[in-house]
């Protein structure tokens, strides 16, 4: 078992733990151990951990809901920080201003906003992620996306600089892309400006309809990461994959979902290697058949550089 390097000012509950399985912190339920793992309960604890990792010159990364991650079976070096305890949000029904910590589940925020008569996040009710992850990936569904309603984010750099604020304009948003994916920045919180004064019952009907649509057209009963590939607009990744007859195709415990071809599910006993091999196979087959390179939405950690 590794020995904790250097000196860390221990804040209650955040002493890094060695060799913690990351499979329990990803929605695919695969992945090896983190060399060091911690789950802070406050922004101050998070800052302490990031500063410690920087001082030790060790790799550092954050994990939200783990719904957009594929982690190598061999695990990850350095410090992995789980953001799930950093939850909380404030909503102003009069102005429409919503502030939420990075670990707040985006479906919870969607429901709270609807209950407060705030229109804008109904699309997010079925997104299996956190506010932080949504701002990084520009998560979206049902014709809406994070960038439509985000006003700003508060971030800290992994080199310890910050916190500081970035506006939506500074984040350079595009389809499933943002500046945050290219920088060593960790989202601490986000501010949204929603549309106030709407009827709760009407918003609730919309959120219920959106959630029903997602649960009936996507394989929610099995572990997955959500959509694996970005849509090569105006085409749909799922349709390109389905056209090749890959629905139901299996590699080990990984399967292209028979319900939605842009989902790879863990039918039991899958490894990260199985899923990674499936991703590569789909990319190769679609490229050969359609002349289109599919780019994953999912972030692969611990693997060689991939498209």
From Swiss-Prot:
Residues 29-197 form the FAD-binding PCMH-type domain. One of its GO terms (cellular component) is cytosol. InterPro entries: FAD-bd_PCMH, FAD-bd_PCMH-like_sf, FAD-bd_PCMH_sub1, FAD-bd_PCMH_sub2, MurB, MurB_C, MurB_C_sf, Oxid_FAD_bind_N. The active site is at 176, 227 (proton donor), 297. Keywords: Cell cycle, Cell division, Cell shape, Cell wall biogenesis/degradation, Cytoplasm, FAD, Flavoprotein, NADP, Oxidoreductase, Peptidoglycan synthesis. It is an enzyme of class 1 (oxidoreductase). GO terms for biological process: cell division; cell wall organization; peptidoglycan biosynthetic process; regulation of cell shape. Its EC number is 1.3.1.98. Pathway: Cell wall biogenesis; peptidoglycan biosynthesis. GO terms for molecular function: FAD binding; UDP-N-acetylmuramate dehydrogenase activity. It catalyses: UDP-N-acetyl-alpha-D-muramate + NADP(+) = UDP-N-acetyl-3-O-(1-carboxyvinyl)-alpha-D-glucosamine + NADPH + H(+). Its cofactor is FAD. It is found in: Cytoplasm. It holds the Pfam family MurB_C. Belongs to the MurB family. Cell wall formation. This is UDP-N-acetylenolpyruvoylglucosamine reductase. It comes from Prochlorococcus marinus (strain MIT 9303). The gene is murB.
